[in-house]
Amino acid sequence: ASTAGKYASAFGIAAVVFAKTDPAFSDKLKERALAAYRLGREHPGVCQTAPGVSPYFYEEDNWHDDMELGAASLVAATGQKSFLNDAIADARAEPVTPWMGKDTANHYQWYPWHNNGHYEVWRHGTAAQKAQMASFYRRGLEAVVGRANNGFRMGIPFIWCSSNLTASFATQAYLYRKMTGDNRFREYEAAALDWLLGANPWGVSMIIGLPGSGTFAHDPHAVITSRMGLQLTGGMLDGPVYRSIYGNLKGISLHNADEYAPFNTGFIVYHDDVGDYSTDEPIMDGTANLTYLFAAMAGAR
């Protein structure tokens, strides 16, 4: 269901996008969305990746969020309210994305990091359903803020892909504010974005090329940069990790002297080095997450 729900939501959203410009194609996409959704209902549970030679894989443990988004997307694609009931049932099964409030997690254990399904249910739901979805978002935000007792107002766990979690927190805070008009988390939303753009212990933006006049990674773990010399503008990096994680990863080593050594003395570390795949690798899903958030913010101006 964790994979089928993702497919159902992708095809369902695409069916809506192409409904007017290419109705025949839209119908085919809708059929595939429904087929994927049925598969997920028939096979509840998770489908983890199976690595060939890599020592690491994506250890996803949750699936209700995927089926919730799949069902909510089918509400828009089909107009059938029965899918809304399914989505609400899944939302109630996992009201808060489990990493929120935790200090650690396995690699991609609770994915996606942000549950957009709650927002999609809110868009289609009754007043009572809208209020419940907003309360689910609020509970998650409160859990993270409860751990943000530091100068950077950061309450996320610094596991692998911490930038993903940071962007996801900011996304959820933004959507909660949009849904409710409640600004109580706005300073933490801003702090998360500030962190990604360079207001962090290293003074380094976690987004390559942004801001243009700022400090960002020039030696990321990316073959396009290391072999072709091309800048991956807009790519969001994994971000800092706990020292304990970095120190125990296999096959990792710095190729150059650590230019940020004076700032890597605490419990989290970051290196702008092609050899550090844990903190300096551009990530596609995180970049997509951030693109969604930045686009929403631009549209709201």
Give a label for each model feature:
Residues 47-52, 96-100, 145-156:
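Acidic/His metal-coordination segments adjacent to aromatic residues that form catalytic metal sites
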Residues 1-36, 43:
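A conserved hydrophobic secondary-structure block that centers on an alpha-helix together
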Residues 100-109:
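Zinc-dependent metallopeptidase catalytic helix centered on the HExxH motif
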Residues 1-6, 10-14, 54, 60-89, ...:
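Aromatic (Trp/Tyr) and acidic
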Residues 20, 26-30, 45-64, 86:
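N-terminal carbohydrate-binding/catalytic regions of secreted carbohydrate-active enzymes
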Residues 56, 102-103, 156-159:
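A ubiquitous short alpha-helical element
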